[in-house]
């Protein structure tokens, strides 16, 4: 049997939460004890920063906002970040990879996140952003602001994963509590960071180093991520199929992905044929021209359970679209013109249905209760 190899690289990975929603997500990751990464929370709201349990916090734009927040104005968020650009640069400096978590449509997240990403790009840091989009019922203005913020952010990040809050209405049960929804929301961003970071930071039977991750994610544009968890005899097949099929994904051809990153997380009982099963399932939907990187992370606490995380990069719309293209459009027109890629969800083991045939072509609708989704920042504030 293979022996786990020691960590052969010491890549510095930082997770930056920008604004209220991003900071809350980072706080959740700290509590969940994701290993091998440094956490930062950035906000214009001094009171919000004092409340969260994140070791390193950065207040921006104090001369502009006086510590009172950006007031849902992205321009204030942007100028606040630019005011403290040197402070942000010091926080990012020395990183090999940076994750940026933010909610789009408000002030600080929408305005400051692109500035953080621009600084990271100037420093030559591999940068991945995971952001949320508002509900449609929040209004056209907020949606268009979010779309503009996403396009601005896309100019500077290497890969961008977008989580649509509006999908909550379709997949969450009406009886779910706010606390459960908040917990589910935070798990979305945690899953994105954990699935990628652990490939680098955790030893495994087949290690993936930072250079492999960089190859798959560098300058790839829009991305999609999925996670599947299963146990039992067919856990490898089931987990990988769940990871690449989601009721949140609409009309997305994953065969167009230019890069695919796969993390298999299991205990010491992981078998060679299970590794092969996951690999064959992933290759069944990916293009022959795609760069596919598959690695393992060993977690002694996962006795009979196996988790597969798939990140497909270089799919969907082109990078660096012009913001002026959408300024005069309604939110409906914007959504029709730009097809964004959505973060996958992991269904509960008791509710999962397995797709058996031609995964890349199937369009089956699966009724599953998700383990996690995102909640917008304005709902978080109401719950406080």
From Swiss-Prot:
One of the protein's GO biological processes: FtsZ-dependent cytokinesis
GO molecular function: GTP binding; GTPase activity
Source taxon at top rank: Bacteria
Keywords recorded for this protein, A-Z: Cell cycle, Cell division, Cytoplasm, GTP-binding, Nucleotide-binding, Septation
Function: Essential cell division protein that forms a contractile ring structure (Z ring) at the future cell division site. The regulation of the ring assembly controls the timing and the location of cell division. One of the functions of the FtsZ ring is to recruit other cell division proteins to the septum to produce a new cell wall between the dividing cells. Binds GTP and shows GTPase activity.
HAMAP family registered for this protein in UniProt: FtsZ
PANTHER family named among the record's database cross-references: CELL DIVISION PROTEIN FTSZ-RELATED, MITOCHONDRIAL DIVISION PROTEIN FSZA
Protein name (Swiss-Prot/TrEMBL): Cell division protein FtsZ
Species, as recorded: Buchnera aphidicola subsp. Acyrthosiphon pisum (strain APS)
Gene (UniProt): ftsZ
């Amino acid at each position: 049997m293979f022996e786990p190899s020691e960590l052969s690289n010491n890549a510095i990975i930082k997770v930056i939460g920008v604004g209220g929603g991003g900071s809350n997500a980072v706080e959740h990751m700290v509590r969940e004890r994701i290993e091998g990464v440094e956490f930062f929370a950035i906000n214009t709201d001094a009171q919000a920063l004092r409340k969260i349990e994140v070791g390193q916090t950065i207040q921006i734009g104090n001369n502009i906002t006086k510590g009172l927040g950006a007031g849902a104005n992205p321009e204030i968020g942007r100028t606040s970040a630019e005011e403290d650009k040197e402070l942000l640069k010091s926080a990012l400096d020395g990183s090999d990879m940076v994750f940026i978590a933010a909610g789009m449509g408000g002030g600080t997240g929408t305005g400051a996140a692109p500035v953080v990403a621009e600084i990271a790009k100037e420093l030559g840091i591999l940068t991945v952003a995971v952001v949320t989009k508002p509900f449609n019922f929040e209004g056209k203005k907020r949606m268009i602001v979010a779309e503009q913020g996403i396009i601005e952010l896309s100019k500077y990040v290497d890969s961008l994963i977008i989580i649509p809050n509006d999908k909550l209405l379709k997949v969450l049960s009406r009886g779910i509590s706010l606390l459960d929804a908040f917990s589910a929301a935070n798990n979305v961003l945690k899953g994105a960071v954990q699935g990628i970071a652990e490939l680098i930071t955790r030893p495994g039977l087949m290690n993936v180093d930072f250079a492999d991750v960089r190859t798959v994610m560098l300058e790839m544009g829009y991305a999609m991520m999925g996670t599947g968890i299963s146990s039992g005899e067919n856990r490898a097949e089931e987990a990988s199929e769940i990871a690449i099929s989601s009721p949140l994904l609409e009309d997305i051809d994953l065969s167009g992905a230019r890069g695919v990153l796969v993390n298999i997380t299991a205990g010491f009982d992981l078998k060679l044929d299970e590794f092969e099963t996951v690999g064959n399932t992933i290759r069944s939907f990916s293009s022959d021209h795609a760069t596919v990187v598959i690695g393992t992370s060993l977690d002694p606490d996962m006795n009979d359970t196996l988790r597969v995380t798939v990140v497909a990069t270089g799919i969907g719309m082109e990078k660096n679209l012009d913001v002026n293209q959408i300024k005069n459009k309604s939110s409906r027109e914007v959504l029709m013109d730009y097809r964004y890629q959505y973060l996958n969800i992991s269904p509960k083991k008791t509710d999962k249905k397995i797709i058996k045939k031609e995964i890349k072509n199937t369009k089956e609708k699966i009724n599953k209760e998700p383990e996690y989704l995102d909640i917008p920042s304005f709902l978080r504030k109401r719950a406080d």
